[in-house]
A protein has these predicted regions:
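Active-site neighborhoods of metal-dependent hydrolases
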Residues: 19-178, 275-277
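Functional cores that coordinate and move charged inorganic groups
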Residues: 1-10, 17, 24, 36
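C-terminal helical cap
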Residues: 119-129, 134, 139, 147-150, ...
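Conserved beta-strand positions in the central sheet of alpha/beta enzyme cores
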Residues: 12-14, 75, 216
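Alpha-helix termination/capping residues and helix-transition junctions
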Residues: 7-10, 179, 246
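C-terminal cap of metal-dependent C-N hydrolases
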Residues: 211-272
């Protein structure tokens, strides 16, 4: 494969670009009027690349085996593309109303002149293609993980309705959808990331005399990652007779400094509200 030598210099990769393309024996089956500079074309056809590459599974496996051999770190950023498989859902996520500032909402909105705002004439068939793409993509994420590959969690936020903080938690959910155990996902999001960045002091987890970088959560994320969302979750009260709102990161401790996350969320909400009338 032509990727063999190039992969030696590829210490980390983000997204999924280049992996399925490298497995194809030729060019992707683009229509004759395809224009990469037209982002509707670009992202519409991106929905078919993994399905096409999946016809050459042994070649895909060779690409991944070369990445594994070279100890390449992979940051898939599944969350930022999720709007392609369910556009109306990501546009109406419950945190947007309170926590997405007007200027960012305008940047998200479809516009031919802005990157990653290509959702005009986005079709049912496009979403179906992307759903299939995710199934195959996740299968290879699991293969990479099962064979010793290092994954990290990123979100590439501020595009396609992916909102800071919330999108990272959604990325953890998508790793779980790919078949990875929540304990391993926490490692992907924490110590794996520090090792990749060269933060050796922070890469060994919680231990005595280590830097106090902790998140204190109202709930058990190993049971349900949704308890980490700032919007929280609904659950039965202890007596089982009513619904209560709980969850969310209560406190963040960074370098020994304690931050009240609920207070910070209130400040964000107040700022977002202040921008609505301008």
């Amino acid at each position: 494969l032509i990727t063999s030598d190039a992969a030696k210099e590829m210490l980390t990769i983000e997204h999924t670009y280049g992996i399925p393309q490298a497995a194809l024996p030729g060019t992707q089956n683009f229509p004759s009027d395809y224009n990469y500079s037209n982002e509707v074309d670009r992202f519409r056809m991106s929905g078919y690349i993994w399905t096409e590459a999946d016809q050459y599974r042994e070649r895909v496996k060779q690409v991944f085996d070369k990445l594994l051999e070279n100890e390449t770190v992979w940051d898939p950023t599944m969350v930022v593309y999720e709007g392609h498989r369910d556009y109306e859902r990501v546009k109406t996520l419950p945190w947007h109303e309170k926590y997405t500032v007007r200027q960012l909402w305008e940047a998200y909105s479809p516009s031919p002149g802005r990157h990653a705002t290509h959702f005009f004439n986005w079709k049912t068939s496009d979403e179906i293609a992307w759903k299939r793409k995710y199934q195959i993509w996740m299968k290879w994420i699991k293969y990479f993980f099962d064979n010793g590959g290092t994954l990290v969690a990123g979100s590439d936020t501020a595009f396609i309705y992916a909102l800071f903080g919330f999108a990272l938690i959604r990325e953890l959910e998508l790793f779980q959808e790919a078949g990875i155990h929540p304990i391993d996902i926490i490692k992907i999001a924490t110590t794996n990331a520090h090792k990749t960045l060269g933060n050796i002091e922070l890469s060994n987890g919680i231990r005595k005399d280590a830097p106090a970088d902790l998140a204190i959560i109202d709930g058990n994320p190993l049971d349900n990652f949704k308890v980490m969302y700032g919007t929280g979750i609904q659950s039965y009260s202890e007596e089982g007779l009513s619904i209560t709102q709980r969850g969310g990161v209560q406190w963040t401790i960074k370098n020994g400094i304690i931050f009240d996350c609920k207070k910070l969320l209130h400040e964000v909400r107040d700022y977002v509200e202040s921008q609505k009338g301008e």
